[in-house]
Amino acid sequence: MAVVIRLQGLPIVAGTMDIRHFFSGLTIPDGGVHIVGGELGEAFIVFATDEDARLGMMRTGGTIKGSKVTLLLSSKTEMQNMIELSRRRFETANLDIPPANASRSGPPPSSGMSGRVNLPTTVSNFNNPSPSVVTATTSVHESNKNIQTFSTASVGTAPPNMGASFGSPAFSSTVPSTASPMNTVPPPPIPPIPAMPSLPPMPSIPPIPVPPPVPTLPPVPPVPPIPPVPSVPPMTPLPPMSGMPPLNPPPVAPLPAGMNGSGAPMNLNNNLNPMFLGPLNPVNPIQMNSQSSVKPLPINPDDLYVSVHGMPFSAMENDVRDFFHGLRVDAVHLLKDHVGRNNGNGLVKFLSPQDTFEALKRNRMLMIQRYVEVSPATERQWVAAGGHITFKQNMGPSGQTHPPPQTLPRSKSPSGQKRSRSRSPHEAGFCVYLKGLPFEAENKHVIDFFKKLDIVEDSIYIAYGPNGKATGEGFVEFRNEADYKAALCRHKQYMGNRFIQVHPITKKGMLEKIDMIRKRLQNFSYDQREMILNPEGDVNSAKVCAHITNIPFSITKMDVLQFLEGIPVDENAVHVLVDNNGQGLGQALVQFKNEDDARKSERLHRKKLNGREAFVHVVTLEDMREIEKNPPAQGKKGLKMPVPGNPAVPGMPNAGLPGVGLPSAGLPGAGLPSTGLPGSAITSAGLPGAGMPSAGIPSAGGEEHAFLTVGSKEANNGPPFNFPGNFGGSNAFGPPIPPPGLGGGAFGDARPGMPSVGNSGLPGLGLDVPGFGGGPNNLSGPSGFGGGPQNFGNGPGSLGGPPGFGSGPPGLGSAPGHLGGPPAFGPGPGPGPGPGPGPIHIGGPPGFASSSGKPGPTVIKVQNMPFTVSIDEILDFFYGYQVIPGSVCLKYNEKGMPTGEAMVAFESRDEATAAVIDLNDRPIGSRKVNLY
């Protein structure tokens, strides 16, 4: 639907193309610009769509030809009414003052006009007069104060540079009121004209030469008087205007003083439009003299260049010139990356500063399919990028040549260097933060990466770890803002075979980070000394190890080292777990040198390792040794039991279930003596065959909280998050038993009627196991256990636990509907001191799930992203917000194709809310994303 916008403040020199250039990038149909003019300089613009009109309204306050314009919503009715009103005003003005255009053919003036002029002998030839007749008639009527002849012939033959206002009704209306005292103005020296008997012989007078003054014309007898005009007080006589140069076409009578509002002489032979001669009042007279030589201001070479950022990689020089259509582009230089491909940035040189000024107005406009940023640039940037400079000698007004400006030495003035070297804390500084540097990176590599940019001496800082290798972080400070912006443009360019992330950072933030890195090194050295002095101290309790699960079974030590690239770790500190046959278990253990490095490894959680998402959990050294002795079994989606080292249930030793634990005292010999199945051991990895997963709750403390409820499917809208797979470890119940599902199954679901293990139909359990059947008293355990279970699950009379094992371990509670405990610990209402009424909920930090009003991580949904978007691009989009490392999850459909959606977890609800408010409808690539 077409939308009409009303524009006010349009200068008189602007045309439809200027308006279209102002709204470049928006769709305006042909014939959609209507200039009305008037006192407010109005125009109406018709946009094709509502979106174009909305974007157009955002440009209110911009400038067209140096004049600020205002945009208002309008309608077609208002536009038509204003156009009709303007047309009527124009027609009325034409009726009052017919134009005396010599080149226009048409009928002679109306009888009313000839009656007012009352010149029957000259009116017939007035429609198409020759230049000589016009001159003669003008001179004759001027000397006899013939007002109408002056207002038509002189206006009709006015030079074109006088503008439209010179012949407007308002301009002509002043002539009758000021022409009567013209006899007081001394004309140029003209000899007296001989008396003529009457006017009829005038056509027979031979033409008089054009050049003024006219020396031979005789005086004309008086003409019949014209109706009286209101008298005007006599004006001060003007000085003789003999010094005024002749006009072309021939001059008419000298302008009276009341016409320009001041008694100062006004030169009409200049190229300025008289509508822009300033306020028309005697208080502010305009002194204009063509003979005065005004020296033009020197042109700063830096005013000719602009920098363009964010262009499409496929953009060519012609696309850049089309983007700046209507402006005089001198040259275009597209910047390349290290392999010669366009990096989306470029420099453009214009012929004049005016073109540069207009080009800067096109910031954030559309080039092909991307919004580009246009910012000022310098000649030094142009030269550094490989652009050529042609020095042209400037011609001054007197014809003297001026040498080309010396720009390069100026940029390296001593004062500038002195300012750049200042280490004042009040200085903002132009610093960048580098991430992803190669481990062997040195200062020379950084200088080569930022080649041709002015770097402050001794400002390159590369962070090194305790092993003496680079950690991949670095800082650089530049001398000026132009080089600083150019450095930011090299974000994600390659240094060697690694792309470098270049992020802006304040000088204060840079110094704080450097100080933090140095303190970390000092603390590490102190920790090393303490470890040497007290090797058995608190080392075992420090979480300096990582347990990596859900990795391919064919993983090698080198694959793990490459996965941990950027974190200092010794090759001997990596252990890939294997079974008795030497086959990989899909797990690895890594021992780091300090807790900081171990915490860094958590950032790699759910990152791809040889095509699979690796789960990284930080554990203590004691836990690592325990895992080495009894590695937990792993299925398709990772561990089925929590890793050791998590909070144990009070009163439950860490034996039967690592991290949650069944008391080994309650299960002597790791078996159930009264089951009737000798040798059917329940291993420490879990209760295989009894429907209990061996590691269903990773780390039991919310280590998997970010994606327990949010997987590849969107939250609350997809299938339940299951833990399919087999139960590793030794068991006597035959083949592995898949655990029940989490979302809709009986895994802590609090739904009665779960089938017993004996007759559940699970593989390897074809017979009704004594003690696990449906009888009420088949299993008699110690006094701490309640009555015999009727169903080994959530049914009545479920397997009881020791006293105090009522409502689950403290601190593991969560909102209803979250991951519950194993089936044996479900909410069975059995008699005795059995399990309590509530399920054991294993969830993330408080407030992470649907419970409201609690601080904690919050997940938002991102939609309408490009299908080719990567996790790094999503993290760059949320740069500056506290995103939980490794929490970005892309969504795929059933065919494995990306859907353009993702889930991102933030460290707090406030951060997530701020991200939604600030970044909603912002573009990633060429598409605007939606945040929920």
Swiss-Prot record:
It is found in: Nucleus. Residues 824-838 have a biased composition (Pro residues). Residues 304-379, 430-507, 856-932 form the RRM domain. SUPFAM superfamilies: RNA-binding domain, RBD. One of its GO terms (molecular function) is RNA binding. Residues 783-811 have a biased composition (Gly residues). InterPro entries: ESRP (IPR050666), Nucleotide-bd_a/b_plait_sf (IPR012677), RBD_domain_sf (IPR035979), RBM12_RRM1 (IPR034591), RBM12_RRM2 (IPR034594), RBM12_RRM3 (IPR034855), RBM12_RRM4 (IPR034856), RBM12_RRM5 (IPR034854). CDD domains: RRM1_RBM12, RRM2_RBM12, RRM3_RBM12, RRM4_RBM12, RRM5_RBM12. The modification Phosphoserine is found at residues 352, 375, 420, 422, 424, 525. Residues 392-401, 408-417 have a biased composition (Polar residues). The keyword Secreted does not apply. Pfam families: RRM_1. SMART domains: RRM (SM00360). Its main location: nucleus. Residues 97-116, 392-424, 717-855 are annotated as: Disordered. One of its GO terms (cellular component) is nucleus. The keyword RNA-binding applies. Keywords: Nucleus, Phosphoprotein, Repeat, RNA-binding. PANTHER family: HETEROGENEOUS NUCLEAR RIBONUCLEOPROTEIN-RELATED. This is RNA-binding protein 12. It comes from Pongo abelii.
